[in-house]
């Protein structure tokens, strides 16, 4: 299968476009997804938005999954907390993929048996907007559904980086968020966000380039008790360069519940 997808990139607040041609990559993913060759319906010849998909399905028996966006392979073998298109092989790797504006569908198939549909996610995409599509649910055989966040990816101020947080962890509950230098004393730290509820986005802070540790504690934890109460902690694996943007996601354990964890998505 040879599929051409028009990818949109932001420039000065507008979408520019450049064409990426998938040859071996598309053929490999199509075979893994068990799909038929078909004309690519995702070439944005009209108004387009951008999306990325994140697997937060808390049912190990249904993971990993293949994601099929509007009939076109979008990701294969996506384990818990993995995302696409970030995990696609080069040259298809990207932070987001372009898709025509309007109502769209992502079908999730079990990688080990692509005759099994894990979930069908219906989303609505507005032109010139970025979205993260989280596949959620699955614990105890429950249904898999979509939770959509609108991602504001305006240019980061010169010489700064942006760090935002999304709470997708029922086990973590409502939290206070601390964004500090690694191993900084939480007793004297000022929270970047307080009372961040489940399925809520903290739009972020802009800080100097460097490495950061993002920690959460149950909302209202007194300063002296914060270090012992940390329920998620993520340290950026490398220093974030100027102009970069990251989203830290709080999530439950792979089968649901505790212990919660956190991981990083690259925005810019």
Task: Walk through the language-model features, giving the residues of each.
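Intrinsically disordered, low-complexity polar regions and short flexible loop motifs
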Residues: 33-268
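Sec-dependent bacterial lipoprotein signal peptides
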Residues: 1-32
């Amino acid at each position: 299968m040879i599929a051409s997808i028009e990818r949109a990139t932001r420039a000065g607040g507008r979408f520019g476009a450049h064409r990426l041609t998938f040859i071996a990559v598309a053929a490999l993913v199509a075979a893994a997804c068990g799909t038929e060759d078909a004309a690519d319906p995702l070439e944005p010849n009209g108004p387009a938005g951008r999306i990325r998909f994140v697997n937060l399905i808390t049912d190990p028996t249904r993971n990993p999954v293949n994601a099929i966006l509007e009939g076109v392979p979008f990701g294969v073998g996506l384990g818990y907390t993995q995302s696409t298109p970030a995990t696609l092989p080069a040259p298809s790797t990207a932070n987001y993929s372009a898709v025509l504006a309007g109502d769209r569908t992502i079908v999730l198939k079990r990688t080990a048996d692509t005759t099994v549909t894990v979930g069908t996610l219906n989303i609505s995409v507005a032109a010139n907007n970025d979205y993260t599509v989280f596949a959620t649910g699955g614990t105890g055989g429950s249904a898999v559904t979509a939770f959509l966040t609108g991602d504001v990816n305006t240019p980061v101020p010169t010489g700064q980086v942006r760090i935002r947080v999304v709470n997708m962890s029922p086990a973590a509950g409502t939290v206070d968020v601390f964004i500090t230098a690694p191993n900084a004393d939480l007793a004297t730290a000022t929270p970047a966000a307080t009372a961040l509820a489940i399925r809520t986005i903290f739009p972020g802070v802009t800080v100097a380039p460097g490495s950061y540790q993002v920690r959460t504690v149950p909302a209202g934890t007194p300063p002296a008790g914060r270090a012992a109460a940390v329920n998620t902690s993520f340290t950026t694996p490398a220093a974030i360069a100027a102009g970069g943007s990251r989203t830290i996601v709080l999530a439950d354990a792979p089968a649901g519940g505790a212990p919660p964890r956190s991981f990083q998505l690259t925005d810019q």
